[in-house]
């Protein structure tokens, strides 16, 4: 009976997802004739040039109920008509009369719902449908939203004035800005509190002044399967700059770029692919947008037309949160919806030592001994792919012949002050001993017949039974004494798969990292209350609740260093407080020079890990390198009170520890241009040496800056500065009070009763800072 019940359940799940997944094949596997490889990032813009599709252009607001905050937008039906002019072939949108039968059953120019509400005085939400069918999923069921947002009870009474309707528009206002819905031509106009237009949607009549017949705000109905996708198009103003979109390795300012928001394995931070795309961005004009969707999005920020943001969404509805304010305001508002990063345990801010890979108990214990022998402050030993019986073959068990007493090993490491992290992944090859069980129990993503869509069994984390099975395996390791788990991969959920959620891969592919992060983080937190932490590679909107993440497989060269720094800054501009990277790069043994210059960036990040192709251990490289490694580690451990307080502040406010200058100095135009320096917290500026040598040009925001190593004072503006003993430029903001601790070899030995407050003062009348000790409930503001 169990077998029959299981088979029936699987058939129901497959049938449930069938319609959606059929559309996925049409939309995703081949876009406008472009064949995509499995899990390749998708360019959704190609669908919006397909002559076989029907195009519906937002035209007018035909009705609106201000009491309900909803109305109807009429969409005019068009087709793309080929046009030849002096041997140049193109297309223009041309009005179309439908040939659908029976014609009385359908609308040529449908009127479809729009809904608007204020969430807070700084956040408005606008939803638009492309079909008469209202989606069934509620906010309470959405995994991208945090629990606090789900629990909210309607609009805050102080969030806005009542909407005002005039002959030409409906206007929603708050103290920070307004949303104006113009009736004809239909537009959404976003203004600041002074009435300045920040951005607005494009209407077809906006093409009247140009030969470029740019498609305005529209949606398509595909000729292949009648599926729909929406294309919001907004104004991009002269001088406008766009930031965010996740852990992007390209230039921080996305204007001029085409950004694909689909989770992929880019094979490193030197390409335009992303392990961690996030459908959120903000502008230097004072607004931000969260595209609430899990479907792929291609953001054309002025790449094809310099005056437009073209958001090519695979989703059939638009659900946008629009934020008002400066970067800190916007990040706080966004993370109030999708969640803030939790405060992480003190030990996690220490040094993590790893390589690919330690293969035995003795090897792990020897690494711990060498760290203590060489007096390198450290807190974590990580075992990567080699702790199983067969390398890379995850079965949640230590290899018996190489790990004679894993529990004893974990106890010894703990006694010596080390926490232990283990690698794993959610894919099971046919040779894995769990493969038959996963298939038999239906714990994997399936295809249209209930079989395998790809070579491996990929755990389906939308299935509660899969989550329970997976967490039981991890829990066994936790009970042995493991502290945390590396949450590797997660980018390969098949687009053509069928998921227990009832959704196809179009909507589940990007959600996969979020579900994976959540399942792992929750079991770690359950077994180590208050110390929930993972080490994850992939992410989506909301994954910041399940910290932390690292930058992936960087090349061991200057470009790998640049890509990681850009990625970390962009990730921080997307709502993630904590982030790390592999010091020296990952792919091959790191040359000593690049590894040495990478060290300060690693130790002045929220989390610090040496990992990659061996050797990563400093004593195996050279004596001088060991000294340099030790110097950087000692610097961070002495700065641990500053690190810990800044981390707490970031977790409460949705701010990044590795912080682009524009976040801290939004009124400094030069700060918006910098992408090879960063603020470590709010008071320390770090400029890594991006090339060989010991000197570099640095941009400093207005004011005085004190060299952390020499005490020399610099004025704001461009300066050429020589690095000190630590191979990086490290400067402290004038008026900073930085708490330091006596040197300790492990975080649990830090003497918090002997904190030294160091004042960095040039012109400032006083020095201020933050202090937060283990056991404290609130951050203390300190002053001297």
State the predicted function of each range.
Residues 1-29:
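Bacterial Sec-dependent N-terminal signal peptides
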Residues 26-338, 342, 346-347, 356, ...:
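N-terminal accessory segment at the very beginning of proteins
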Residues 121, 129-131, 175-177, 184-186, ...:
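An acidic- and aromatic-residue-enriched active-site/binding cleft used to recognize and process polar
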Residues 131, 140-151, 200, 377-629, ...:
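Aromatic- and carboxylate-enriched substrate-binding clefts and catalytic-loop regions
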Residues 280, 371, 413, 520, ...:
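Conserved, mostly hydrophobic/aromatic
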Residues 354-356, 364, 370-373, 383, ...:
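C-terminal substrate/ligand-recognition segments
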Residues 360-373, 467-476:
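Short, acidic/polar
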Residues 523, 529-532, 541-549, 564, ...:
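Catalytic core of carbohydrate-active enzymes
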